A protein has these predicted regions:
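Terminal helix-turn-helix DNA-binding modules in bacterial transcription factors
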Residues: 180, 199-243, 259-267
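Short acidic-glycine-tyrosine-enriched beta hairpin
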Residues: 59-74
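Short, Lys/Arg-enriched, Trp-marked, Pro/Gly-tolerant hinge/linker segments that flank
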Residues: 125-186, 199-211
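Short beta-strand segments in beta-sandwich/barrel cores
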Residues: 35, 50-56, 69-70, 78
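Alpha-helical residues within the helix-turn-helix
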Residues: 184, 195, 199, 232-233, ...
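Ligand-binding loop in jelly-roll beta-barrel domains
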Residues: 76-98, 103-105
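Short hydrophobic/aromatic patch on the recognition helix
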Residues: 67, 193, 197, 241-242, ...
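Generic protein-terminus/edge-of-domain signal
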Residues: 1-52
Length: 267
């Protein structure tokens, strides 16, 4: 494992599946970056130390605040965008190890131990013994397996009719149409739509739309969009209603969230 500085998410990382290793790479970015959709044979864990990262795949959308990580399974088509200055890291896992983790993307809280292990692995010198690397790799992998999951992701449905519906919602999160209205627009009963939506996304329709709004709000806060503008962009009649929703989901107001996020980015 060697220290490297590459483009965000390392689209040009070594792409092979016959090497049994964990490759740790520290990323340092000082500007907004965006990568095109790409895939690689390694599983990838991406962590944010400062700033916010958004990751898009064919199956969904994840945001990664400071002190959080996102898991991207092998051969998953994905792209990423940072919101403001971003500093973070990646750990690449060989396919064999990746099979022991989730087969779909997930977000996790970064533990202090994981952060230190990544920095240690990324700063190894060329003469570090393989035995030392192997021992630390095992500890690093054990820590990854036991990371606490967070809910900073949103799955898209696979059914074309439902995908068209959610694509429409994501392009206009101010759309307040009810489940019944959406059901009529795609020719389903509301009961059938509710059942299929839950089966496809793991969430009820209202919860899915609320999470989409929260994730979008987090991105806009990172881009320094005023709270008033965010509220109206997301379809709320007034700022108070938006703040109440955000506090109910996140446990803090938007202003408190930004303060905490900035503090975590510094630490």
């Amino acid at each position: 494992m060697a220290k490297m500085k590459k483009s965000l998410l390392l689209a040009d990382i070594i792409d092979q599946s016959d090497v049994d290793l964990i490759l740790s790479v520290e990323l340092i970015e000082n500007q907004i970056r965006e990568t095109e959709l790409h895939r690689h044979a390694f599983g990838q864990l991406v962590g944010s130390l400062e700033g916010l990262l958004s990751v898009q795949t064919e199956s969904g959308w994840w945001v990664v605040p400071a002190t959080h990580t996102v898991w991207i399974p092998p051969n998953t088509l994905h792209g990423a965008k940072s919101h403001g200055p971003f500093r973070g890291w990646s750990v690449y896992l060989d396919p064999k190890r990746s099979q022991l983790l989730d087969s779909s993307p997930k977000t996790f809280q970064t533990t202090p131990l994981l952060k230190e292990l990544v920095h240690r692995a990324a700063s190894w010198s060329d003469d570090t013994s393989q035995a030392v690397k192997s021992r630390l790799s095992e500890v690093l992998f054990d820590e990854i397996v036991n990371l606490p999951e967070t809910l900073f992701g949103l799955l898209q449905p696979g059914l074309p009719s439902l995908k068209k519906m959610t694509d429409g919602l994501l392009s206009n999160l101010a759309d307040n149409r009810s489940l019944e209205e959406w059901a009529r627009s795609i020719g389903l009963s509301s009961r059938t739509l509710a059942r299929r939506f839950n089966e496809q996304t793991g969430l009820g329709f209202s919860e899915w739309r609320q999470r989409a709004r929260v994730l979008s709000a987090i991105e806009m806060l990172a881009d320094n969009v005023p709270v008033t503008n965010i509220a109206f962009t997301l379809g709320y009649e007034n700022v108070s209603a938006f703040i109440a929703m955000f506090r109910r989901v996140m446990g803090v107001t938007p202003g408190q969230y930004i303060q905490r996020h900035n503090k975590e980015s510094i630490s």
